[in-house]
């Protein structure tokens, strides 16, 4: 058994007391505002994972997937995979049903995004990736500390990583946000 100092024991007691008060009080009013934003952001992180896979196949098919592009794409894909994996495992820890709903919502959202963007490949996937990164960053910035998803913060670097591809950014953020419904 480890010995605790008096201050440590009092801190543990106070933390336990505060937790019981928070549970008894129920959700805070700002939870009603932040939860839909957090759900949308996590869904878009999943969509970004799909968009990166589409981007790889479209770049390969068009012959633009050269050494420097592959290297930078791999760095970007690593960032996306980490964020998506953490989001999925976080929801799976809550409940298996929550993880399945996350997958279903992500599939539906990506299908909607793909259907509303009428650009040609690989410009289509490239613009979807860049726009999703900007939207995720914007949503994450609007969410307070409790719902803030720190693994999504590095996704801001993806547009700079993929800049070497040389495809024009059409800034389709508004189109994606307009077509996504909760």
List each model region and its residues.
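Long, low-complexity or tandemly repetitive, helically biased scaffold regions used
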Residues: 5-179
């Amino acid at each position: 058994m480890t010995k605790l100092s008096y201050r440590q024991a009092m801190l543990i007691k106070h933390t336990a007391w505060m937790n019981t008060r928070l549970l008894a009080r129920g959700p805070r009013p700002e939870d009603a505002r932040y939860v839909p934003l957090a759900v949308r952001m996590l869904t878009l992180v999943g969509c970004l994972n799909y968009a990166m896979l589409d981007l790889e196949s479209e770049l390969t098919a068009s012959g633009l997937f050269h050494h420097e592009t592959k290297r930078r794409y791999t760095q970007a894909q690593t960032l996306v995979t980490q964020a998506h994996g953490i989001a999925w495992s976080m929801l799976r820890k809550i409940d298996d049903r929550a993880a399945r709903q996350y997958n279903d919502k992500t599939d539906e959202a990506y299908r909607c995004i793909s259907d509303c963007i009428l650009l040609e490949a690989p410009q289509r996937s490239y613009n979807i990736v860049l726009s999703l990164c900007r939207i995720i960053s914007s949503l994450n910035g609007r969410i307070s500390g409790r719902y803030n998803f720190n693994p999504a913060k590095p996704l801001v670097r993806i547009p700079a990583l993929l800049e070497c591809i040389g495809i024009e950014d059409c800034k389709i953020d508004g189109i994606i946000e307009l077509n996504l419904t909760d």
